[in-house]
Swiss-Prot record:
GO terms for biological process: immunoglobulin mediated immune response. One of its GO terms (cellular component) is IgG immunoglobulin complex. Pfam families: C1-set (PF07654). It comes from Gallus gallus. GO terms for molecular function: antigen binding. Keywords: Disulfide bond, Immunoglobulin domain. Disulfide bonds join 28-85. PROSITE patterns: IG_LIKE (PS50835), IG_MHC (PS00290). SMART domains: IGc1. Transmembrane segments: none annotated. PANTHER family: IG-LIKE DOMAIN-CONTAINING PROTEIN, MHC CLASS II-RELATED. This is Ig lambda chain C region. Residues 6-99 form the Ig-like domain.
Length: 103
């Protein structure tokens, strides 16, 4: 089966969660990749954090999907600007970045 690089989608914390002003969760969805091993890092304003990443699951098209979550305090979220989900697959890093000011 040919190697396929993942598609990455990065979601900011929900407005509902931010309105509660206690925590902020970022979600990185990683879809349509093969083979299954992936590693995920989170980079916040240049510093690396580790999130919680699910084990890859096989999709109906025989490729894999996974997701990674980064939980922050609301004050942590509001004190940084650039949030990046960095996925390493098959020796290649793919990143998706969001800016808090644009959310």
């Amino acid at each position: 089966q040919p190697k396929v690089a993942p598609t990455i989608t990065l979601f900011p914390p929900s407005k509902e969660e931010l309105n509660e002003a206690t925590k902020a969760t970022l979600v990185c969805l990683i879809n349509d990749f093969y083979p299954s091993p992936v590693t995920v890092d989170w980079v916040i304003d240049g510093s690396t954090r580790s999130g919680e990443t699910t084990a890859p699951q096989r999709q109906s098209n025989s490729q894999y999907m996974a997701s990674s979550y980064l939980s922050l305090s609301a004050s942590d979220w509001s004190s940084h600007e650039t949030y990046t989900c960095r996925v390493t697959h098959n020796g290649t890093s793919i990143t998706k970045t969001l800016k808090r000011s644009e959310c």
